[in-house]
Amino acid sequence: MDKASATANSHEADAFSRKAAELVARHRIDPAALVDRDHDELAVREISLGRGAYVRGRLSLLTAVAEAHDARVVFASTPTGTVAYVAGHVSDLDVVEVMYTSLHAQAASQMSAVRRTTGAATQRYRRSFLFGYADRVATSFEDARTAAAAAAP
C-alpha cells in the first residue's frame, strides 16, 4: 500500500492496490490462521470522517474496505463531524485501518488533480469520483478474495 500511495500515476497505484488486496485475501484464507483465530479478540475502532461534501463518499470507501475484511461499519453525526465505528476482529481492523487510510490518500490525490469550470461542478465530479472509486475498490477486493479462495488447497 505504501507503493500505491507514493506514486502519482493512477494506473500504477491501482495495480499496487490490487496486488495488496490479493495478498491480504490470500493470507486471510490460510486455514491455520482461521483455526487459530481467537473469537474473544473482537473490538470497535472509531474513525473520524470529518465534515463536508465528501463524507458520504469516504463512508462508502470505508464500508467497502471493512466489508471485504469481515468488519461492519456504523456511523454517527457529532458536533465535530461524522464518526464511523468499525467492528470486527482486531487483526481485521488493523488491515481495514491501513487499507482505508492508503486508499483514501490515493483517491484524494486523484481527485485533487481534476478541476471543472466551476467550484460546484468540481465538487460534483469529485463526489461522483469517490463513490465510483469505492465501488471499484469493493469489486477489486471481491475479485481478489474469489481468486484466493479458488487457489486455496
Question: What is the predicted role of each segment?
Answer:
Residues 12-19:
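Short, charged, amphipathic alpha-helical segments
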Residues 25-153:
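Long, charge-patterned amphipathic interaction tracts in eukaryotic proteins
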Residues 10-12, 25:
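…; additionally, a secondary subgroup of soluble metalloenzymes is captured
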